[in-house]
């Protein structure tokens, strides 16, 4: 009886530990919203969206975007 109680308690402890590890490693995938770099799996939060790397458009891209919005 004592062995059964100990093994059941051990199994429940392992299940609780695995659930805790699953909750603490949760991170946001690429393309989803974020509030800081630590929320993202790849640790890059650009403009409140998880990205593989931040893209900073150059002058030419900004100018083309400006003319598209004027039409």
Swiss-Prot record:
Its main location: secreted. GO terms for cellular component: extracellular region. The modification Proline amide is found at residue 57. Disulfide bonds join 27-41, 34-46, 40-50, 45-54. Residues 61-71 form a propeptide. Pfam families: Conotoxin_I2 (PF17557). Residues 1-26 form the signal peptide. GO terms for molecular function: toxin activity. It is found in: Secreted. Keywords: Amidation, Cleavage on pair of basic residues, Disulfide bond, Neurotoxin, Secreted, Signal, Toxin. Expressed by the venom duct. The mature protein is identical to the Conus imperialis toxin AC A0A125S9E2. The cysteine framework is XI (C-C-CC-CC-C-C). Probable neurotoxin. This is Conotoxin Lt11.3.
